[in-house]
Every structure is written in C-alpha cells, then in structure tokens.
Amino acid sequence: MLEDYYPSTTSYYHGGIDDDLYTAKWGMVMTFLDLNDSSLTPFEGTHFALIGFKSDKGVYINNGRVGAVESPAAIRTQLAKFPWHLGNQVMVYDVGNIDGPNRSLEQLQNSLSKAIKRMCDLNLKPIVLGGGHETAYGHYLGLRQSLSPSDDLAVINMDAHFDLRPYDQTGPNSGTGFRQMFDDAVADKRLFKYFVLGIQEHNNNLFLFDFVAKSKGIQFLTGQDIYQMGHQKVCRAIDRFLEGQERVYLTIDMDCFSVGAAPGVSAIQSLGVDPNLAVLVLQHIAASGKLVGFDVVEVSPPHDIDNHTANLAATFIFYLVQIMAQHN
C-alpha cells in the first residue's frame, strides 16, 4: 500500500455531462483510478495519470509565500473546463493526491516517488500537480526508480531559479531539489544533465552561477536570452541538449512567468518568459517523444487573481498532453 496516498473521490467538473466527444470537456472524460488496486495491470497505448502533491513545506522552509498546498484542487478545477480533443483512444486518469500535513518533507517526497514508480509500472505517463518545487525531487526519484541504473534521464526545468542550493545545514526545501538530483548522480557516478529555461540573474546569487559554471552537465538560458532568441532558436538549443538522450523529465515552476501572467506563485517575478513562447517550447519538448513525465509547481491559490495562474498551469498541461499523445 502506498503511504500518504489518497485516491480521488470528488469530481472537479460541475457542468452538464454530454456523451458526444465533440463537445466533451476534460472533467467529463477523466476517470478516477486507485493506485492501490492490486488487480490493475499495465495499460496498453499512451495514457496519463494525474496526481496532486499537497505540500508547500519546502516553500515554508525556504521563506516563500505558502499556499501551494491548495494548488492541486485549483488546477484540477481549471483543467476540467477545457475541451477534450483526444478522442477515445487516450485516457487521463485522476489517481488522487499525496498528502500528509503531519509528515516531513522527506517522507512526502518518498511517498510521491513510490506513487510515480507505480504509475510507470502501469505504463501511465505521470503528470504531477504541485505543491512547492520540492515536488520535483520526489517525481524525479520515482522516475529513476522505474529505470535501470544505466538508463539516462535528462531534466529540463522552466524556472527563474536554479534551485541548486546546498542543503547540508538547512535540510531540503523548495530550492534544493536539483542539487539533491545532482548529488545523487555524483554518488552513482552519472552525469547530471540539467537545462534551466528562464533564469533571472536578480534571483540567483554568484555562488549558484559559479556552481553551474563548474558543472559539466548543467546548461541554462536566461529569460532575456529567450526573449532575444525567439522560440525557434530556443528549440534548437533544447535539441542539442537532448541529443543522445532517450528520456527527459520536465518541470515547470510557475514563477518563471511575470506577475502579470502568474500573480499567484510562491515567489513573484517582475520579468519572466512569455507564456505564448513557453507553449511553443513545451510542445517542442513533448514532440521529441522523449518526455516521460512532467509537473507544474508553485501555484499559490491564496495569492492568485481570478485563477489566472491556476488556469495558465492547466493550459500548459492541456498542450503538453495533446502533443505527448501524438508522439509516444
């Protein structure tokens, strides 16, 4: 039995039900699935599993604006309203949440990793609704556990921050997840392939830039780089990064976007990547056929305005799933 795991029991869709797929919405089509059901066998074809990670403990430890614990419900509500374009050959299963208000950050990350591995064993593509960016380490661990030690797993992070902070004295938080991944790779004598899109210089100290400069497998583009390059050159940079890689895990921190597009985040961003450009880049990553799982994190509903940020996060999920369904 999975720990800290709660299957979904409540629908987030409150509109009229229509059997016609031409007019269906996500909320009509998504089906509940209990990962603890021992009768389940691996699914055939391309299907997705949506799980919430109800934790912003890492944000609290990192002195951010708490509230991301409420994000999974907010994103589900927005996603349920979107039109369904995938016919009846692709399914998105809502498998519930990882939740544990009295559990430690490390315990919740471990619980998420086990749930992710269970999804992969069932041949379901994981979609995780954070939660703070501590979500990423649990998601990454689960993906790695589903692979053999020699299998590669590159990481692309759309984020204003490197999230490579040391954690030896403070313990892990929302800003340390990718340093934990890096350290795991070093311990296993693997190269940590990590590409950050949307870095803002005013959000990262010199220690982090120095760490990146000395690390062979880490690359980044600043938000200003992306603005100047345009999506086609950014996509070519991603292609070069993924050359020779078989798998990539994608994580989207909503603080990558300006406060005008994403006001409800744990750490607001005055600058930021254009969401329209981001959609094109995300679709390109999905079209590589290498994307094995993704998450959206750091949506903070108590700080949102008219669900702008939750809706944008749901929009990214919509377009990623559309492309992944065609290229997997």
Curated annotation (Swiss-Prot):
Swiss-Prot/TrEMBL catalytic activity: N-formimidoyl-L-glutamate + H2O = formamide + L-glutamate
KW Metal-binding (keyword) present: yes
Organism per entry: Streptococcus pyogenes serotype M28 (strain MGAS6180)
Annotated binding of Mn(2+) 2, by residue: D159, H161, D253, D255
Needed cofactors: Mn(2+)
Record pathway: Amino-acid degradation; L-histidine degradation into L-glutamate; L-glutamate from N-formimidoyl-L-glutamate (hydrolase route): step 1/1
Cofactor details (free text): Binds 2 manganese ions per subunit.
Listed Pfam families: Arginase (PF00491)
Single GO BP term: putrescine biosynthetic process from arginine, via agmatine
The name this protein goes by in its record: Formimidoylglutamase
Annotated NCBIfam families: PRK13775.1
Stored HAMAP family: Formimidoylglutam
Keyword Nucleus among UniProt keywords: no
Any one GO molecular function term: agmatinase activity
Keywords annotated in UniProt: Histidine metabolism, Hydrolase, Manganese, Metal-binding
